[in-house]
Amino acid sequence: MLSLSERAPICSPQSAPSASASDTCKMEENMNQQKTLEADISNTSVNQSPQSKILPESSPDNQDAEHEYRSPPPISESKELSPQSRTTPGSSPDNQDTEREYPSPPPISGSKEISPQSRTILESSPDNQDNGHEYPSPPPIPESIELSPHSKALPESSPDNQDIEPECPSPPQIPESKELSRQSKILPESSPGNQDIEPECPSPPQIPESKELSQQSKILPESSPDNHDIKCEYSSPTPIPESKELSLQSKILPESSSDNQDIKCEDPSPTPISKSKEVSPQSKILSESYLDNQDVERECPSSILITESKELAVDLPGSISLAPEKTASTDVGENSSLAFIFPKSTLAGDDALKSVFDMAKAHLECEDSKVKEELYVESTVVIRDDMVVNPASGVESIDMSENLLESLMEQSCGTFYMDGTTALEGFLSGSTKEEPQCSSPIALSTCSSPIALSPWGEHGYYQGDSVGSSLWGVQDDDPIGNIWPLSSQAPALQYSSGSTAHFIDEATVTHGNNGVVLSSTPGEEVGLPNSGVCTDWGLVEQVNPETNDASVSMIDKNSGLVDSQPSANDGSDVGTARNTNHNTNLSLNHETAVPLSRSSGEASRKHGFITDLNVATSEEALGNTKNWNPYAGNANRGSQRNHHRDRYSQISESWLLSSNYSRSRSDGFGTGGSSRSTPRGQTQRGICKFHENGYCRKGASCNYLHP
């Protein structure tokens, strides 16, 4: 062995004139050593050990003792070259004679992949390079499919402790491992002061048949460089065989302090989780621990053995807890559904339920109120368009508004229905644009309380004011300006089942089961054929007995019977053609319903319900009823009638004649209804709309005029 005193460098500092000359000599020595090594490498085997891929450069001062020991034995039959000696440091020409005195390292045969423990060997200082190769090369690693990545990225070591870095042997063989332990994928950087004993720990043992490895330490916390000397003193985690899903308990590990990192790995690795199909993710997100308490973080085992668990312990992500320190988790049984934890609201549970119940109750009450306001119409609905008024009488039809639509909804013991042929536009008149918020002039009642609706939004309409002719339509002529005022102190409709009440020119047409009731028509007697416990709808009217030419038609509130008292001037009966002051011919075929369509002549023909109201009024009768005002204490109603008189005068008589009810039929009310009458005091038949080209589609049963 050569000593330092026996070295004879070519250019020494004593023989050189200056320091620059000594540096030049050292550079020349390094170049000569590199050239010599290149010639030696060409004679070696094809594959060499990767332990010396990048050897640190050594200074020329310590180069004489660098190769005093055995060189590595030759490596033969290796598929991949050993990168350990690809780039060997240059040696001085003084020590070149003893460079090959020792045999090469033993061959590493049958190795598919070489251990990457020393793929990247950090450069060491030239002062400590003399003891860099005092030990033999690592033993061969045969038939290893994938090597342990425990030392893929080795931390940089200081040049002071590099002399004993390769003392540890290479990791043992890990055969048939599909996926290696990821515990040390990312190794924390260590300080150069404690790097001398870092690789002393053996590599992790074999992990056979593990499909997915423990991810407990995917992200290892950074450790301080002061306590890194004993980090790897303990063994790697035990094998986890046949685990399909790994424990997610510590996916995100809390950051640890640098002061207490020395005992972080003192405890054993997690216990094996075998045959676990679904693993509890209860602690996916672990709370971050403080830096001072990190020394006792891993004193306990990290995971719990879960064997043959099929059900998940579900941590509901949608559950929001007001307390952020608590995690809302629900264990789900095998046959049970997920129990969700709903977020807490500022409103208490009782208040929330109360508000929901209040909303539902209000909705039901609204619907109930609509039910009470709806008039039951079984089969007959009479509209303004289907009314016939004698043009000579000057009486115009009722102008019903949109609000009547809601009042004519059908009610049959809690069941609602509308006729399919109902056309809602029939309730709209030609002068609705001129009227300010007209409502129905009908007083509705559903078995209990009557609802009085004013036609023009007047408050005291049914509280003492006389119901003038403006309610039912008037004409500009003064002699017939106040025609048939409907006098009713408190008009109310009595409830009955299976019937219909309508207003046609001061007349309530009641379509009963066996007959027709016409009430509140002056100068006419109407009888009720059928009366029961719950009878037809009828308008309760109180007529002033001072009238002479008009009959008083009363309906009993209890029985619904019509009490008609003809006047002394009117002695005619129903069923006779009367040539009196008021002649009303009502012909009803009460088997089917009346269509609501304005232009549905076909529907009228199908249903066969025709109501003809031909009124012939003389000046004598008008004179008797002109100043008829049964309401006491109200003398201003006449001016209101005059105000509303012009509003309804715009309806043309030709439009009235073109309606479906311009035809007069006298099926059960006498023979005089079908006779041709004069404009004053006589009846008049309508013109048949079904007569085309000299042929009527109704046949011989048609009683209308065929021009």
Swiss-Prot record:
Keyword Membrane: no
Zn finger spans (C3H1-type): 682-707
Ranges for region Disordered: 1-290, 558-605, 624-647
Xref: InterPro entries: Znf_CCCH, Znf_CCCH_sf
Organism superkingdom: Eukaryota
Keywords annotated in UniProt: DNA-binding, Metal-binding, Zinc, Zinc-finger
Gene Ontology molecular function terms on file: DNA binding; zinc ion binding
Record field: compositional bias (Polar residues): 30-52, 81-95, 112-129, 246-260, 279-290, 561-570
Low complexity biased stretches: 8-22, 579-590
Protein name per UniProt: Zinc finger CCCH domain-containing protein 20
Keyword set includes DNA-binding: yes
